[in-house]
Amino acid sequence: MSYNHSPKLDDSLSSLKEELIRNNQIKLDDYHRFDVKRGLRNSDGTGVMAGLSRICSVEGYYIDDGERVPKEGKLIYRGINMTDIVRNCQKENRFGYEEVVWLLLLGDLPTQEQLDRFRGVLAEARELPDEFIEDMIMKAPSPNIMNKVARSVLALYSYDNNPDDLSIENVLRQSIKLIAQIPTIMSYAYQVKRRAYDHKSMYIHQNDKSLSTAESILHTIRSDRKFTDEEAKILDLCMIIHADHGGGNNSTFTTRCITSTGTDTYSAIAAGIGSLKGPKHGGANIQVHNMIADLKKTVSDPTDEGQVADYLTKVIHKEAGDRTGLIYGMGHAVYTLSDPRAVLLKEFASQKADKYGFADDYKIISLVEELTPELFYKYKGEKKKMCANVDLYSGLIYDMLRIPPELFTPMFMAARISGWCAHRLEELCSGSRIMRPAYKSVALPRAFVPIAERNIDHIVPDYVPSEER
């Protein structure tokens, strides 16, 4: 596929870019002057309170006499500790993602009979409309799977006989179908990308209704359709821990924000996918993968503590890695002492990394987790609590499952769709206002200048407080 460039536009872009940048800079002092909650964060790093939810709670600290006090992290689904859900599934050696979907959507744990019936509903709903694969996925392939899934979700609007009905029953129907179909679309988009961009064989496998969601994903992304029960349950674990993370994370907030406008389900979920695609959000797991790959390529012994520390120091000083100064997979907006998702993934990786041939990678990542807090302290001089987040270990788990890097973020999406749909439904049930925050204009008033009197070197003035004008 090619894109037709415009020579005139290409020649003009450099000068246009310079003018755009010059006229769109806002001074940090102005943000402080108007007490702007940049990133919708308070001055202490906590999130601005934008709503209420019964779906999920993310806990990483408590407030004592106005001070933020770190504590071990907890992720709570509908009042139930997510770790307890995982432990029960491990104890009973069963799949749990479908149970979590029910819990997030409907608010309580299902009985065995309800769960069995719901699994059947999801399995049947995985099927895509007739000709959808050929018309919407195989045509106009994309090098980015998230982009392709977002386009496909928008296209499903045209296949729905009642796409704009916002009744709870209709949106629940749409939600269940999307929760079932998005993993299927993801798998097929990956196969088409393999053929169109990687010049490899493409395998379009039919869905097997007897399989769980995790099993179905492995069945459709692997050319031989083969996987072990252990592999499927590892992926199921990943899906449980990624299913939701409260209403304030960017993609869920995006979904709720767009839902508040009264738009359709497909538009709201496509917006959530677009948010999760960003490297500062769902794309962070691939950034960890790239950082570890660069570390292994850069140092002679990536399992040596001193060499890893030297590399990470260079990363912090923007002298290595992607030159952003970020050590991906470390730190979180809420979690302080621990991220329960990272704890579970690290536990599994420590037990199975050697079996799957990733013992060295596990050691490297463990060193990154161990060394980073002290290195940041030396650089910044402040003893801020910093823990590994879910992205540090999720890529390693996906590597162990032979899931290619281009599917890391889509795998996150395939699980998080359940949380997005739950929050959309809650917004429809409880929300009554369109979300409309304020932006303060810092453009000074000025007179219109006739075109004959305009000067190419004119500079738009910066903001000046009224008392200083």
Describe each region flagged by the PLM:
Residues S2-R469:
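Non-transmembrane, aqueous-exposed alpha-helical and coiled segments at domain scale
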